[in-house]
Regions:
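N-terminal intrinsically disordered/low-complexity leader segments
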Residues: 1-8, 19, 142, 197-198
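Helix-turn-helix
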Residues: 9-12, 16-58
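Short helix-capping/turn signature of helix-turn-helix
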Residues: 49, 94, 108-115
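Hydrophobic alpha-helical connector segments
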Residues: 58, 72-102, 153-160
Length: 198
């Protein structure tokens, strides 16, 4: 059997952390549990990561990237702004439906970080990434639809993040995708009203 590189071990430990936390919650993601899930000895963890916090940061980055990809890949050239926003949000909703554990882990990581002074910056970083993703999606949609934004993009991105956060939480509770699509349609209508033709 081929020897794993340090990078491959890191990636496997991050995936193992996700599996454990998705099944049992962030609190269950101890270094021991993660190593057991990955089929590695504890010393391997300390060889690959300086701390559990470093692994949590990498996990958060990986999960946030998957959300962005789900939204951006759903946007189709030739659509108007409202439709592009619907497509991106529906792409995210499909991602949520397919893997609710993904979002539960992100929410738990955020709450865990907010209660841990040494991890407070992790919560800040998570939302910086959300705002960056929303901004990039809005910029990409504006390019595809050949429009400009009539309001400051950081404020609009913040509105989108707040609405998607709320949509995610309510969907995790009630699993009502039809209602979530109604919210997406209203959000898309509102946000697209802030676009003006070039």
């Amino acid at each position: 059997m081929a020897r794993m590189t340090a990078e491959a071990r890191r990636a496997e430990l991050v995936q193992a952390a996700f599996r454990v936390m998705s099944r049992e919650g962030v609190g269950a993601g101890t270094t021991r549990a993660i190593c057991a899930e990955a089929g590695m000895v504890l010393a391997t963890f300390h060889y690959c990561f300086r701390s559990r916090d470093e692994l949590l940061r990498e996990l958060m980055i990986m999960l946030s990237l998957k959300e962005r990809v789900a939204a951006t890949e759903a946007m189709k050239p030739g659509s108007d702004m409202r439709e592009l926003l619907r497509q991106a949000s529906y792409g995210y909703l499909e991602h949520l439906e397919e893997d609710p554990g993904h979002e539960l882990v992100l929410f738990e990581l955020n709450h865990y970080a907010l209660r841990s002074p040494e991890l407070r910056d992790l919560a800040d970083e998570q939302y910086r990434r959300y705002y960056e993703s929303a901004t990039q999606i809005l910029e990409g949609a504006a390019q595809l639809a050949d429009v400009s934004w009539s309001v400051e993009l950081p404020a609009l991105a913040r509105i989108v993040v707040a609405m998607i956060d709320g949509l995610t939480t309510t969907w995790l509770v009630d699993r009502d995708s039809d209602r979530s699509k109604e919210v997406i349609d209203m959000l898309s209508e509102y946000v697209s009203s802030k676009a003006v033709p070039n």
